[in-house]
């Protein structure tokens, strides 16, 4: 025969108690969680990385607290699964019943690497890109947003036009945010942005490659305005893009400030 449980040994579940202030919370959860992640690359092979995670849900006015430990349990469930945008959206959908919530968001920010061949020598090296995946779940509906920062070279058209010996150029960051309603791979977006810079970047270049990069940028000058417009035009023409935001920052080599532009569509 089982002995009765001593009430003194039963731990109270304070967070499940009712709240009397009647104020709903739009987002509550965990933030700044560093956790391993497998990202399915363009070739389908999983790329291990470490992401900075934010997971939140909406909390009704009558509930005192959410179940914080369940967010980490969800991360553990998906830790060894190669992530695609579709699976990331499914993860956000799974979070809602787990947390007894009607709405919730998941954000994962991580470095992503592409192996690139230098333009002349063909020597291979990795280049890193800063990426965010964002899933916003409401009931059975999930909106997926991809944010990727692509470094490129920009060369000033005005400087080229007025100078006899060259033109000032610099590294630029083009940050693209897209809400997808169809298929558009992350690698294709990165390639699209790199095509619209004065020249793309590589991790490792030999002297013949440096010559190519210098001359390629000189033959393809672009203002920061050109950068955002050209990338926006490419995105607007793609049927898989529902909304987009293109942001470019040129770290000017002849000024102590940046040139900056944004296009939204």
From Swiss-Prot:
Annotated site (May be catalytically important): 156
Keywords (A to Z) from UniProt: Hydrolase
InterPro entries on file: GTP_cyclohydrolase_FolE2, GTP_cyclohydrolase_FolE2/MptA
Single annotated GO MF: GTP cyclohydrolase I activity
Catalytic activity: GTP + H2O = 7,8-dihydroneopterin 3'-triphosphate + formate + H(+)
Enzyme Commission number(s): 3.5.4.16
Gene Ontology biological-process entries: tetrahydrofolate biosynthetic process
Pfam families, per the entry: GCHY-1
Pathway where it operates: Cofactor biosynthesis; 7,8-dihydroneopterin triphosphate biosynthesis; 7,8-dihydroneopterin triphosphate from GTP: step 1/1
Purpose: Converts GTP to 7,8-dihydroneopterin triphosphate.
Family statement drawn from the similarity comment of this UniProt entry: Belongs to the GTP cyclohydrolase IV family.
Name under which the protein is recorded: GTP cyclohydrolase FolE2
């Amino acid at each position: 025969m089982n002995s009765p449980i001593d009430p003194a040994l039963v731990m109270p579940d304070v967070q499940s108690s009712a709240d009397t202030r009647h104020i709903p919370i739009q987002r509550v959860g965990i933030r700044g969680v560093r956790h391993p992640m497998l990202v399915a690359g363009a070739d389908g092979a999983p790329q291990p990385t470490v992401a900075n995670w934010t997971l939140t849900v909406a909390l009704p006015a009558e509930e005192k607290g959410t179940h914080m430990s369940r967010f980490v349990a969800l991360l553990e469930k998906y830790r060894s699964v190669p992530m695609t945008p579709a699976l990331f959206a499914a993860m956000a959908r799974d979070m809602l019943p787990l947390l007894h919530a009607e709405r919730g968001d998941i954000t994962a920010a991580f470095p992503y690497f592409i192996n690139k061949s230098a333009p002349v020598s063909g020597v291979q090296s990795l280049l890193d890109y800063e990426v965010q995946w964002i899933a916003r779940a409401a009931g059975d509906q999930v909106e997926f947003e991809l944010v990727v920062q692509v470094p490129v070279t920009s060369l000033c058209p005005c400087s080229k036009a007025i100078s006899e010996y060259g033109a000032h150029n610099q590294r630029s960051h083009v940050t693209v945010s897209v809400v997808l309603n169809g298929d558009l791979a992350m690698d294709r977006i990165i390639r699209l942005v790199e095509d619209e810079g004065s020249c793309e970047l590589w991790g490792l270049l030999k002297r013949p490659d440096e010559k190519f990069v210098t001359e390629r940028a000189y033959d393809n000058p672009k203002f920061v305005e050109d950068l955002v417009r050209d990338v926006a035009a490419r995105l607007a023409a793609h049927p898989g893009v529902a909304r987009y935001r293109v942001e470019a920052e040129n770290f000017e080599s002849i000024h102590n400030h940046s040139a900056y532009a944004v296009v939204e569509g």
